[in-house]
Amino acid sequence: MGQGQPVIARRAVLASAAALALPACEGKREITGALLGASTGRGHLLRDLRAIRDAAQPPTSKQTRVVIAGGGVAGLAAARALRQLGIEDFVMLELEDAAGGNSRGGEIAGIACPLGAHYLPVPGDTAREVQHFLEEAGLRKRVSGRWVYDERYLCHAPQERLFFSGAWQDGLLPLQDVGAATLAQYERFSRLVARAQQQGAYTMPVAVTPPSAAHLGLDAMTFDAWLVRERLDDAHLRWYLDYCCRDDYGTGLHTVSAWAGIHYFASRHGFHAPGSQADTASASEEEHGVLTWPEGNAWLTRKLGDGLGERLRPGHVVTRIREGRHGVTVDAYDAGARTTQRWQAQHCIVALPIFVAERTIESPPALLADRARVMRYAPWAVVNMHLREPLRDRPGAAPSWDNVVYGSRGLGYVDARHQSLDPRPGPTVLSWYAPLAEGERALLLSRSWADWLHVAQAELAQAHPDLRERVTRVEVARYGHAMAIPAPGTLARTAAGLPHSSRLSYAHSDWAGYSVFEEAFTAGHRAAMRVA
């Protein structure tokens, strides 16, 4: 996962796709595939809400205390909190056929795999609500006065490796023969992150602490501009930092703010130069680990959705939210029945992306409209490839959970069998992650699953030239607006808070300016508290 490798030529992709269609002619195994992911047809209905409203039959009307609009992590966390408060009279309206948003999972040939987010870093003490949920889910407990996480779900070693200079190395920071100048810049960046942590709180969720003047200054420039100012120009360091930004924010260091770039490290584990005392000490600390499952964070969203029953209404596109003096009216298009339903409620938790909320709320408040006008989103694809047997490996570090090729545009792949306790090699699913540039969103509609396989194959060819002959099936999850981009100015806008309303509560990670589980969960939990 790295900088600037050119996109594979369209003509070459189509030529390769044709080869897939003729496996018998070349003596190759047949590969099947499918395109999955966010329901583009339903989502694009929001482009012309007037047509839906005019074409719909007169809506039936139902009563409930609370409508939760949106069934992603924020909506699910809100539902959990409502139930904890004793509020059972609610309904959740979700566009997709299953709740979970960007944290849904799938299965190929009986092997679970992620369709989106695939891990959760062990949360710090500022994410109290998330910690409480993990305790409730049985993932952590107190033993002899300290918190201990279930080792089955902490990522097993080896956690990550990088294909660099013709071989695999442990960890993702380039190390092999990088030279003294590179190592010196690693150390300088480590000191700068440590100083930033000491000078001001980098919290997650961000709303825990109001931004300082120093944070707002960093928010006003790009991460790239800050690195230039600090004379951090080493190509290996910049590749790694760009990779980290694309992994968490969907886009690179030329686009995200300096605050976001530093926050990635300062809010969690810091940045430890190789060989430093902190690097050695942190290697064994449980609090720096990540929780993961074969199906990714779908494990968490399924836990959140347990017990919702008929209160969860999948396949429902929210088309209008109208706040009145005595309640809220919510209209939703039932994609299965092809009818519009109307819900009358005392309160609505708007757990929708900001750009969707602005289109669905009648007379949206100025703060919402202003945020929607400047929001930027990163498109993503997740390419799940079922392999009939393990890949042949190159020299160096052993196969890991996260496997990255230096210099590629993708973010590498995770292995669905990594957490398995069965030592016998066998079929598996590799999930390859590909963030796209904002201008490449149309590729999500134009590329076939075969195109995506060849893009993945081209990017992984250095490390795995045998990938094509091992694949049996490909399923591609596509997200046109996968995550908010924390571009310069985002933190300042986040500091303005949420729109004030007596009957609408807003809950989505968009309001934090970037998309991670901790932000979405906390937003949903706090929205439910406002209902009470």
Question: Which residue stretches match the model-derived regions?
Answer:
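N-terminal Rossmann-like FAD-binding beta1-loop-alpha1 element of flavoenzymes
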Residues: 65-91
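Conserved flavin/dinucleotide-binding core of flavoenzymes
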Residues: 27-55, 165, 171-173, 392-532
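Extreme N-terminal leader/targeting segments of oxidoreductases
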Residues: 2, 6-65, 84
